[in-house]
Amino acid sequence: MKQGINGFARRGRL
């Protein structure tokens, strides 16, 4: 996971 919580929560995909 390079995006982290910010990128993950924004896209909504694991």
Swiss-Prot record:
Family: Belongs to the glyceraldehyde-3-phosphate dehydrogenase family.
Top-rank taxon: Bacteria
Main location: cytoplasm
GO cellular-component term (any): cytoplasm
One annotated GO biological process: glycolytic process
Residues reported to bind NAD(+): R10, R11
Subunit details: Homotetramer.
Protein name as it appears in the record: Glyceraldehyde-3-phosphate dehydrogenase 2
Lineage: Bacteria, Bacillati, Bacillota, Bacilli, Bacillales
GO molecular function: glyceraldehyde-3-phosphate dehydrogenase (NAD+) (phosphorylating) activity; NAD binding
Pathway(s) the chain acts in: Carbohydrate degradation; glycolysis; pyruvate from D-glyceraldehyde 3-phosphate: step 1/5
Keyword annotations of the record: Cytoplasm, Glycolysis, NAD, Nucleotide-binding, Oxidoreductase
Location relative to the cell: Cytoplasm
Additional observations: Under acid-stress, this protein is expressed at a higher level in wild-type B.cereus than in the acid-sensitive mutant strain NB1.
Catalytic activity, as annotated: D-glyceraldehyde 3-phosphate + phosphate + NAD(+) = (2R)-3-phospho-glyceroyl phosphate + NADH + H(+)
